[in-house]
A protein has these predicted regions:
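Alpha-helical transmembrane segments of multi-pass small-molecule/ion transporters
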Residues: 1-306
Length: 306
């Protein structure tokens, strides 16, 4: 886990510096990297690891409970934002989405491999593809459209995009019906190397994005630690995993990778939603920054304990 923490710090720093020196070109690089991860790396990782996944009751029920836990966490965030902190809808909407949206793709899969071992990567991929992504494309977009100041896309368009513009999900579907012969050990091992590359490339793009936001005046770096930032940290680090564990404990033996994924920091795409739908962009960027800064040292300690 130490190398992941160092890689994240180095990659974010490199991304910030790249944006300072290359300007708009760095933004093009960052978006290209994210597309490469989405359309090439993650589908390969998903296919070769899901093909080896044993789908039992714990995994199947865990997926449903994962959806439920994220929705409940988002509801907690919304209620705290509106009733306790008295936040405007665009800000409270971000807080709800933070409760809903974790960084399980760029960070979660690699962390699962580093802390739990590569035998758990298939479970981490399953959580990302079958729990987090459906919630993002449906739930997060719906909250953004309902609370933002700009008109959004229609629900049918979002659902259609979820199925036809979601390469990792397609890879998961193919892997579930593929024979084991299509996922030989050598390719599974190669996919583990790709997993280790994801944080390096992904957080370079994060660094570029944060630098762009700071340059445009949307946020300061590091962002101020406000009450809503504190709630965001609690939602991602404590509430989400606690709700999932509480729901699962009476019924199943929750896969370790599912619980670990629930603790991941806020996802980068929250900033994208904030821009598109007119949500609170500085808060969105700040929530991503702070939840990541808090999560990394905690996960580092966990890797030593485990």
């Amino acid at each position: 886990m130490l190398w992941i923490a160092l890689a994240i710090a180095a990659s974010i720093t490199a991304g910030v510096e790249a944006e300072k020196h290359a300007g708009a070109r760095a933004g093009v690089w960052a978006r290209g990297i994210l597309k490469f991860l989405l359309y090439v790396v993650m589908p390969l990782v998903a296919f070769f690891n899901i093909a080896r996944l044993e789908v039992d009751a714990n995994v199947g029920v865990g997926i449903v409970l994962g959806w439920t836990a994220l929705v409940l966490t988002a509801l907690v965030g919304w209620l705290i934002g509106r009733r306790l902190l008295r936040l405007a809808k665009p800000t409270a909407g971000v807080l709800a989405i933070v409760g809903l949206q974790a960084n399980t793709g760029l960070m979660g899969v690699a962390v699962a491999g580093a802390i739990l071992g590569f035998s758990h990567v298939s479970e981490a991929v399953a959580y990302d593809a079958l729990v987090q992504q459906p919630v993002f494309f449906i739930g997060s977009f719906a909250i953004a459209a309902a609370t933002g100041t700009k008109a959004g896309e229609t629900v049918p368009e979002r659902i259609r995009a979820f199925f036809v513009r979601n390469p990792p999900l397609i890879a998961v579907a193919l892997a579930l019906i593929a024979p084991d012969a299509l996922a030989p050990d050598v390719l599974v091992d190669a996919s583990h190397i790709l997993v280790l590359c994801v944080p390096v490339l992904g957080f370079f793009a994060v660094g570029v994005t944060l630098a762009e936001e700071a340059e445009e005046g949307a946020m300061k770096f590091p962002p101020p630690l406000t009450p809503q930032i504190g709630v965001a940290i609690l939602l991602r680090g404590i509430v989400a995993p606690a709700v999932l564990l509480g729901l699962a404990a009476p019924f199943i033996d929750l896969p370790d990778a599912f619980l670990l994924a629930a603790t991941m920091p806020a996802g980068l795409h929250i900033v994208v939603l904030a821009h598109i739908y007119g949500l609170d962009v500085p808060f969105a960027a700040g929530a991503i920054t702070w939840t990541t800064m808090v999560a990394v040292p905690v996960l580092l300690v966990a890797s030593v304990v485990v």
